[in-house]
Amino acid sequence: MNKTLFKSIREYKKQSLLAPLLVILEVLMEVLIPLEMAKIIDVGIANGDLTYIVQRGVILVVMAMLALYFGVQAGNMAAVASAGYAKNLRHDIFYKVQDFSFKNIDHFSTSGLVTRMTTDITNVQMAYMMSIRLLARAPFMIILSWIMTLLLNKTISLLFLIVIPLLGGTLIYIAKKAHPHFIKVFDEYDVLNNSVQENVNASRVVKAFVREDYEIDKFHDISKYVYNLFTKAEKIVAWNSPVMQFTMYSVVLIMVLIGGKSIIAGSMETGELTSVIVYALQIIGSLMMVTFVFVMIMIAEASSDRITEVMNEIPEMQDQPDAVTKVPNGDIVFDHVDFSYSGEGGNLSLKNVNLHIESGQTIGIIGGTGSAKSSLVQLIPRLYDVTKGRVKVGGIDVRDYSLESLRDQVSMVLQKNVLFSGTIYENIRWGDETASDEEVKRVCKLAQADGFVQEFPNGYNTKIVQGGNNVSGGQKQRLCIARALLKKPKILILDDSTSAVDTKTDALIRKAFREEIPNTTKIIIAQRVSSIEDADQIIVLDGGQIMGIGTSEELLKTNEIYREVYESQVKGGGDHE
């Protein structure tokens, strides 16, 4: 773990400090217990002094109870500190992600961010809890036990000066070997999660095409690859335990030989040898504890690197200190705009786009798949930044606005409509959380959603399940349009957002737009000519370039692409009733 992540401890610093302090007190009691046992054996039992045995026994019990108390309290403090640390980490990452542009999110992928906020943070949480308890306990136990061994038998104490560095070096070597493998494992967890996410989201498609076996095989291959990577890492870590066990038995055997000779020579008592063996076991037990924590830390180190990646990611878009906070109107200008998702030097999705949309106009955009229709409109609310040129809204470069102010005045209904778990009221109020019930119903009427909502048994209090799977595609689109309208934006963008709506309802929505929001700039991307033929201007896109601008009548005369689309749909009866 590093400085970036430690900042998230914040209000849990007190518990994080108290836990190791209580552990030290627990260790102190545990180290004194064998000394009392030696006195009971060498003095009380050797002399048959029952009073002495009882007196020392009471002290022994008190020490054990204190050790128990300190241990329990240390555990409680460590649990609170680690759980709080994990809570803060999740909050910090989630807060950070809210500032990410689409490009930042694309860099990590959705499944990658989810893994970091769940599995990776849990790994860091567990390692942190172990660290503030066991990493405080082990060094003090080793040092104090070694000092007590030194006081009882110098020869045996020297044995540990050889053993401890050897074991420490072995642990460091194992850790360095295993760490890269754990990083690979967690990177593959992203792929695994992505596979699960895709399958669950597309479960209807999977079943419709009877592709369950294919999906199972695909998941099995990814899962097996993760298994192989994890096994490779664990095989390296697995050397920890045998090395420790071999060391423990060897040390105990050597101690018994040295201690036995000392007892025969009269330089050591039986109780003292017993105490030395207990101290030796405490030292070796602490070293084994360190190996266990070491494994946790190795896993957590890989996770913390991935979390730090997110925390150190610089949001591509940031507000300027003197950012403009008011959008004057819905006037839009594209001035020699080039755009690439890969940035400077990448393949251009949009090439030398020059365009002026007057405030209040209705603009239609049409073009084939991959013609960059969505790319064009995503530059208006600054979901992405232009690679070259500039986009202006209300006469001001979009990069000069605060993101919140700009996006508050640009309502965009994306191709992929998203509804959240909650009631219809709650979903629509995403556009304006202070809106009254009447305002919600008004925008639903404009979006032609009020009719079907009223037919639900619970009306606007109907619960939308996750992903909006209990409403049809057309209903989902209309609810999303209503949500966008509730913002009362200066610019409304519909990115193929009426594709699942019948042409009659589509016409009613456009009629409502003309009559109820005439001053709002309306940009409609559509595959159907009927959805845009009454627009003030229609933009024809092909290969990221504007191939024509004009009314439907003008384009029929001057633009071959538009004429072909129009004739294939209208004359062929493809979409007119």
Locate predicted features.
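Juxtamembrane helix-loop junctions of ABC transporter transmembrane domains
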Residues: L21-L22, M29-D42, V54, M63-T110, ...
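Helix-loop-helix
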Residues: G48-Q55, L144, M148-I162, K232-R306, ...
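Transmembrane helices of ABC transporter permease
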Residues: E11, Q15-L28, K39, L60-M63, ...
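An intracellular "coupling" helix at the cytosolic face of ABC transporter transmembrane type-1 domains
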Residues: R10-K13, M77, D99-K103, T119-I132, ...
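Membrane-integrated ABC transporters
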Residues: M1-E30, M37, I45-I59, A74-A78, ...
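Short intracellular "coupling" helices and adjacent cytoplasmic loop segments at the cytosolic face
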Residues: N47-G48, A83, H91-T115, T119-I121, ...
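Conserved catalytic Walker-motif region of ABC-type ATPase nucleotide-binding domains
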Residues: V97, F219, I307, F334-H336, ...
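ABC-type nucleotide-binding domain
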Residues: K326-E577
